[in-house]
């Protein structure tokens, strides 16, 4: 009956617990074997997880490489990187030229000369003024700044900065007075250049100014950057960056001086791809070798894994024909030859064979990855079936154990009853013997 409890040796007639343990140990051997098999599969799946990541990395590397874009990539070499920096797009022509930086851009900085006696001094009156900022000689933006009699210089600075982003206000201390300082936030915001006498400037304060402001004094002139390419006209920019001065070429001025510029085809993306491919290929091939070769290899003779190596090696023929790849004794590969020379001397052949390699490698990597994922799924299915078998066997074992307990308990009861009968018979025989002995007297 379900739920019944049986205890060994309750009557003392038969201690069947150890016998039951031995029987159950024998009956549980199939479960132990299944558990060992499941453990082995889990170990294989862990190893395959690491290998799968390498296959995925190789597959993504090949699929994400764009040969057309890489062949169009240009680079700019400069003779003096302290003078300029140059960025180029694929539209840039392959030319050389000189750049003369006449001057770099600078921001306009003004200080109002009256000043506050302390940071706690208040303005003492209510009013407002207008901050006007010229973005060009004819165009400007305006902002109204209101102030009250209890405002300090710090309050005015905060109001100016919170109202707009063209001018940065701050406090200038000359050792005696605290003064308002105004500076452009960026050279690129305005093409206005400051005149030494301030007859032309970008920053203006108009209206009723606090008497502590005074007159503005020039600290630094706003200047536009100027460069000359070769013997051409001087080019001017509000900031230090000159966009598309030549199609696809942008120049950033750093300081006055001259630098040579040479624009040429950039092979770095192709070289980087080939280096990464060789590294990834060698990692995959080396792991295939360790997984499938040797007496204790976990996947010895497993075709799914061995085919990964064979499939990838078949894709290398175009690269070997270009002289860019060579085999090493251990089955790995390395780069050989001069990439730049191959591309420059045989551009059409290089593009054709690289395309052939990429197409075949992409197809093989995809097939290998999918086959490998199927193999992992097969092992996972095996593990799930083992789990189900273990569950069923465990249930059956519990039932069999309960049956054996009941049978042993019944046997113990029977043996206890038999012992009791034997004792009674023994006592009965003793009594008869005693009776017979007494009669003989």
UniProtKB/Swiss-Prot annotation:
InterPro entries linked to this entry: Flagellin_hook_IN_motif, FliD, FliD_C, FliD_N
Entry keywords, A to Z: Bacterial flagellum, Coiled coil, Secreted
Residue intervals passing through the bilayer: none
Pfam family membership, one: FliD_C
Gene field: fliD
Family, as annotated: Belongs to the FliD family.
Protein's recorded name: Flagellar hook-associated protein 2
Coiled coil: 376-416
Organism: Aquifex aeolicus (strain VF5)
UniProt superkingdom: Bacteria
UniProt subunit comment: Homopentamer.
Signal peptide range: none
GO cellular component: bacterial-type flagellum filament cap; bacterial-type flagellum hook; extracellular region
One Gene Ontology biological process: cell adhesion
Cited function: Required for the morphogenesis and for the elongation of the flagellar filament by facilitating polymerization of the flagellin monomers at the tip of growing filament. Forms a capping structure, which prevents flagellin subunits (transported through the central channel of the flagellum) from leaking out without polymerization at the distal end.
Location of the protein in the cell: Secreted; Bacterial flagellum
